Amino acid sequence: MPTSWKDSGLRWYWIVVLVFIADQLSKQWVLSSFELYESVKLLPMFNFTYVRNYGAAFSFLSDAGGWQRWLFTFVAVGFSILLSVWLRQQSTKMWRLNLAYTLVIGGALGNLIDRLQHGFVVDFLDFYWKTSHFPAFNIADSAICIGAGLIILDSFVSGKDVKKSDDIKE
C-alpha cells in the first residue's frame, strides 16, 4: 500500500472534480435553456432533449413511487466511499483502474447532487435511429459507463500481465 496519498490512486482525484463540474454545468445549462421534453436536433441521430429521470440507468425503477431516490443516494455514497478507499490503497501507476474509479465516482456524485437537489436526474443526450430512441443520458452516466468498461477491461488485461510476469520468472 502506498505510504502517501501522493503515491496512491487518490492523485487521480482531479478527474472526479472534472467530471463533476462538466456534468453539473451541462445540467444547469439544460435547466436554464430548455423546457421539459424540449428537443433540439444537433446531428442526424442525435438531439439534446431535456427529460427527467426518477430512476437509475435506463430509467430503472423510475415509477417506483419515490423510495428509489434514497436507495440510489445510498448506493452512490457507498460506492464513492468504497472506490475512494480502493484508490488510496493502490499505486498511482495503476492508471486504468485509477481512471475507471475516478470516472465512476465523478458520475455518481454528479447524479447524486441532482437527486438531492431536484428529486430526479437531468438527462439530455438523446441518440436515436429512425423512430427508436436510446434512453436519454448525461455526462455523469457516460463517465460511469466508461469507468465500468475500464474496470472490466482491466480485469482481462491485468490477468494477462500477471501471466506474462509468471512466464518470465519460469
UniProtKB/Swiss-Prot annotation:
Compartments where found: Cell inner membrane
The family this protein is said to belong to: Belongs to the peptidase A8 family.
Enzyme class: hydrolase
Catalyzed reaction equations: Release of signal peptides from bacterial membrane prolipoproteins. Hydrolyzes -Xaa-Yaa-Zaa-|-(S,diacylglyceryl)Cys-, in which Xaa is hydrophobic (preferably Leu), and Yaa (Ala or Ser) and Zaa (Gly or Ala) have small, neutral side chains
Domain of life: Bacteria
Record field: transmembrane: 12-32, 67-87, 94-113, 133-153
Keyword field: Aspartyl protease, Cell inner membrane, Cell membrane, Hydrolase, Membrane, Protease, Transmembrane, Transmembrane helix
GO molecular function annotation: aspartic-type endopeptidase activity
Nucleotidyltransferase recorded as keyword: no
Free-text function comment from the UniProt entry: This protein specifically catalyzes the removal of signal peptides from prolipoproteins.
Cited InterPro entries: Peptidase_A8 (IPR001872)
Membrane topology reported for the UniProt record: Multi-pass membrane protein
Protein name: Lipoprotein signal peptidase
Protein species of origin: Shewanella piezotolerans (strain WP3 / JCM 13877)
Catalytic center residues: D123, D141
GO biological process: proteolysis
The gene coding this protein: lspA
